[in-house]
Amino acid sequence: MSEHNVYGAAQPAQPGQPAQPRTRIRTHHLQKMKAEGHKWAMLTAYDYSTARIFDEAGIPVLLVGDSAANVVYGYDTTVPVSIDELIPLVRGVVRGAPHALVVADLPFGSYEAGPAAALAAATRFMKEGGAHAVKLEGGERVAEQIAHLTAAGIPVMAHIGFTPQSVNSLGGFRVQGRGDAAEQTIADAIAVAEAGAFSVVMEMVPAELATQITGKLTIPTIGIGAGPNCDGQVLVWQDMAGMSSGKSARFVKRFADIGGELRRAATQYAHEVAAGVFPADEHCF
């Protein structure tokens, strides 16, 4: 099977038959990709317009991340963002992406109290936002929540290693799983898989350890700063496209300079308006 078709793109037409339309990516498609050795990309998305572009590009999974706290709302960390701030973003992404699996982050404070709190938060994202799955941070400590959500029919993406919501207790942005801590990271990965998570994000984990965990688990692993051997990779789209300000994390590669292009376009637009060049005759009725 070609990579193009694995992503749910239109199937080639047989002689005398129309092409088959793309289908919505589901969790079992990701499992099949892992089994067949196909790697896949995930990006964050926070609005209809970018979700539409990423969906057209064939990105199979879109994450409405709590990173919206930083890139949408301007908070310093992901801790302050609320469910009420995230649900409208999820709605827009779901409308813009008819083919991608849309995953919503459960924000800090919405699930730590226990399974009942996690179910209440996840249910809101599924019912009010239209999300197809939710993501929550933590390993063994949230296994009970993951099991409760999956038993209720809610697909869960886990997140281990560096967990941004715990930045204050982790002592800042630090690689996790080095040395003796590797065993705990492995235990976390096994715990979330056994609890029923359909995939697990591994953030800022040594590449060798991430490779080991990917080999141990039957569910897909998704790396962000976890080396090239995870089943999938994820980046915040503003980091990937050159929209973020300041120094990028080591694991980020900029694939474009969208920020620079927007600044140039806005500057040129303002200049032409001030000079009376825009609107020209061709823009008038």
UniProtKB/Swiss-Prot annotation:
SUPFAM superfamilies recorded: Phosphoenolpyruvate/pyruvate domain
Domain of life: Bacteria
Bound cofactor: record note: Binds 1 Mg(2+) ion per subunit.
EC number: 2.1.2.11
Single GO molecular function: magnesium ion binding
Binding annotation for 3-methyl-2-oxobutanoate: 66-67, 105, 135
Family classification: Belongs to the PanB family.
Protein name: 3-methyl-2-oxobutanoate hydroxymethyltransferase
